[in-house]
Amino acid sequence: MARQVSLEKTRNIGIMAHIDAGKTTTTERVLYYTGVSHKIGEVHDGAATMDWMEQEQERGITITSAATTCFWRDHRVNIIDTPGHVDFTVEVERSLRVLDGSVAVFCSVGGVEPQSETVWRQADKYRVPRIAFINKMDRIGADFDRGVNMIRERLGANAIPLQLPIGKEDNFSGVVDLVEMKAIVWDDESLGARFEVVDIPADLQERVDSGRELLVEEVCTHDEALMDKYLGGEEITLEELKNGIRKACIDIKIIPVLCGSAFKNKGVQNLLDAVIDYMPSPVDVPAITGVVPDTEEEITRPAGDDGPFAALAFKVMTDPFVGQLTFFRVYSGVAESGATVLNATRDKKERFGRLLKMHANKREEIKQVYSGDIAAAVGLKLTTTGDTLCDPANPCLLESMEFPEPVIHIAIEPKTKGDMDKMGQALGKLVQEDPTLRVRTDEETGQTILSGMGELHLEIIIDRLQREFKVDANVGAPQVAYRETITKAVEVQGKFVRQSGGRGQYGDCWLKLEPQEPGAGYEFVDAIKGGVIPREYIPAVGKGAEEAAENGVVAGFPIVDVKVTCYDGSYHDVDSSEMAFKIAGSMGFKAGAAKASPVLLEPVMAVEVVVPEEYMGDVMGDLSSRRGRVLGMDARGGAQVINSNVPLASMFGYATELRSMTQGRATYTMVFDHYEQVPKAISEEIVARVKG
């Protein structure tokens, strides 16, 4: 089967936003207008096509990024709907990695909210071109100009409106298109599928003229040929203006802004047009780079069907009907179902079973995938998120993804022996799907410990264990992922000697332990001169120290941000071994850490609370009682926004508390910010609790 749509006519985009900005609804409308779904799915009916896991339909939020494909103006648009809840930022990170462009949806009332900032920073990191869509223009308190200004101020982005709204709140009826200089009004009866072009309303003419001037000037600033024409007083044609916007948008020099109300079916077709007109095709973005495995030689894989096959797996899911589904993005080349590919990350060959094009949770079987496609494969056994799949004859390793460390964990115990076996398999599958979920066994208690990005994240994992995998388990209260560190430098000897007849053991090293900058992690430095410890034993010292750091000296939490330098020692010709030096390194580290004034560290979260004025005092008082530090306040659409840093340990159950304190009128978001030292009194309580 030949390629249906050329690369130039392919768009891979994500839809990203804060929770409740209306992202899934926007995607639903896109699917409706492009003719993929014949009935509009509403999120609050629990019927949205993209939200297909049971938990998503119950909670009305999007958890996994479903990939779907649709057509508009002869172009193929692959859309990835990403979750907006902060516990699921990894989903956003992994989808941004494989997109060429993104639509950022903002709520016209709330404007730029904390999660929007997090997602925006992730998109900056991967240099993803964006279009902004200010949604919910029909809501009370809708304010387009404030939305545009917040994108400029809070996100530091050059937001340039391509449209202005006609009316607002209940009177929102259409938009003025500043590119084509025409007014568009939607017809409510045809669900917004029909619209008419009318004269620009006289009361808007002045705003429209200045908006148009700003747009033309801004586009010309980034294009010399257009600038010369503009300064020479010549008229810039529609085609030149559109090309200029496209170029500036792809280079992330401007962020085009559109507006509408997806729920009321207004503005979605224009958004689709903008995706086609201004978002990059796979050919317009820089070619992806990778390295040749083993040689570290850098290579690029430009988009095109002629090159060798190279793809990145960005999501693994367990599907009740076909088993494991691996979603991947093809960067170059072509592959057929049944083909053998190399997983360059693991250096193992895999075979594509069936290849599927996904439409939320419906699937269409395909025979081939081409450069620029996003598809799913059945039958890959070893591949996990972030792995590279490539042509075995032309191996190439694309850069993988980085995932944040989990901040919260819970203990979980299966109720019966039967559940025990099922739980092991189920957790194995879930970890493969979600790299931010960690599973380990606590050696002392024998409990299974799950670590994740937040309470909601772990709640949903437990829920899936019960629903999808039918595992019954007792779940402990969530625990904070404390860490330990040292606060002063020490020098210490680690010596392990056993010499009582026969082959003995002898390892002797001198270590210097120094505190590092927060976030620097563990570092081992070899400063041995003159062979006082033979080369081959030095890594063992480092390994011993690193393993000892897993269980700290204050309360058994991992020790972080420490630099260990091995600078002296001695050895025995016969009795020294790697094992002996590993034990010596471990003994030295433990002794040193205990002397180096060790302290407990706790995760501190950036908490933003949006609260009506009358509850302000209560909420501030409550944050202080949770050891929170208020960093600042500002007004946003009739409510107050409080920014603060609060230790995670004091935030358990905050959602319920906040709801009852403000009669459900306040909302909050929480993102991990940094680790900091625990106050002495609280540290003593924690130690007593752990050792008790």
UniProtKB/Swiss-Prot annotation:
PROSITE patterns registered for this protein in UniProt: G_TR_1 (PS00301), G_TR_2 (PS51722)
Cellular component terms (Gene Ontology): cytoplasm
Record domain tr-type G: where: 8-283
Molecular function GO labels: GTP binding; GTPase activity; translation elongation factor activity
Compartment(s) where it occurs, according to its Swiss-Prot or TrEMBL record: Cytoplasm
InterPro entries: EF-G-like_DII (IPR053905), EFG_II (IPR041095), EFG_III (IPR009022), EFG_III/V (IPR035647), EFG_IV (IPR047872), EFG_V (IPR035649), EFG_V-like (IPR000640), G_TR_CS (IPR031157)
UniProt-listed SMART domains: EFG_C (SM00838), EFG_IV (SM00889)
Entry keyword Iron-sulfur: no
Claim: Cell division is one of the keywords in the record: no
Binding residues for GTP: 17-24, 81-85, 135-138
Gene Ontology biological process terms in this record: ribosome disassembly
Keywords: Cytoplasm, Elongation factor, GTP-binding, Nucleotide-binding, Protein biosynthesis
Known role: Catalyzes the GTP-dependent ribosomal translocation step during translation elongation. During this step, the ribosome changes from the pre-translocational (PRE) to the post-translocational (POST) state as the newly formed A-site-bound peptidyl-tRNA and P-site-bound deacylated tRNA move to the P and E sites, respectively. Catalyzes the coordinated movement of the two tRNA molecules, the mRNA and conformational changes in the ribosome.
PANTHER family hit by this protein: RIBOSOME-RELEASING FACTOR 2, MITOCHONDRIAL, TRANSLATION ELONGATION FACTOR G-RELATED
Similarity comment text for this entry: Belongs to the TRAFAC class translation factor GTPase superfamily. Classic translation factor GTPase family. EF-G/EF-2 subfamily.
HAMAP family linked to this entry: EF_G_EF_2_B (MF_00054_B)
Descriptive protein name: Elongation factor G 2
Gene that produces this protein: fusA2
